[in-house]
Amino acid sequence: MVPGVEIAPGLFLTEALMDWGRPAPLIDTAFARWDEPVAHHRLLHFDTETTGLAGGTGTRAWMIGAADWLADGRFRLRQLTTTTMGAEAAMLRTFAQWLQPDTVLVSYNGKCYDSPLLKTRYRLARLPDPLSGLGHLDLLHPVRRHWKGVWENCRLATAERELLGVVREDDLPGSEAPAAWLTYLRGGSAVNLRRVLAHNTQDLKSLAGVLLHLAESPR
């Protein structure tokens, strides 16, 4: 079974609330060379799982994960998973509803990969692009400025291990996510699909953790 509630034909939503991080009301974004702090509830951490890593018009996102802090400080994690090709438009419409004009996106390499891919999918679906004009904190860039040449690489898995002490166990690598989805579409098991959701969940939690580390560390 695919986790979550089917909110449209072939589109499943999972949602969880948790205590994760203790953000101040205003997040110091000087680490990203921004002049002004950002209220924590404006931040939307997002990460996609796709049919391939190359990008381009032939690549589609079959899952969008997003997480934000509510006004009371609780961390809300939501994931949209498509189980049919035809559910993509409903997923894109739903994700657009999660964005406000003052939303600030938080990603890891999302400026180069996730955001352009989603913009392409909105265009091909003939839907308005809700990402244009939004602020975007791509944490890969400040991580590289601080630790390139110090760590073996600056992948998110390395950053979460070095900064947060996170060591993943039984994690399905992101490179195997396309096969997990295609296997399910062809009538196969949902076991690896659920492992992708777990992988995406940790990605979102690590995004928030790395963000807070960068914001709170002396420079």
Label each region the model flagged.
Residues 1-40:
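N-terminal accessory regions of nucleic-acid-interacting proteins
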Residues 31-101:
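Conserved RNase H-like, two-metal-ion catalytic cores of nucleic-acid enzymes
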Residues 37-38, 128, 192-193:
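Short hydrophobic "helix-edge" motifs at membrane interfaces and signal-peptide entry regions
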Residues 47-49, 114, 138, 203:
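Acidic active-site catalytic centers that drive phospho-/nucleotidyl reactions
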Residues 52, 64, 106-108, 167:
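Short beta-strand->loop
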Residues 55-57, 117, 146, 211:
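Short, function-defining helix-loop hinge/capping sites that tune catalysis or transport
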Residues 74-163:
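Conserved DEDDh/DEDDy metal-dependent 3′-5′ exonuclease domain
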Residues 156-219:
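Acidic, Mg2+-coordinating catalytic module of metal-dependent nucleases/exonucleases
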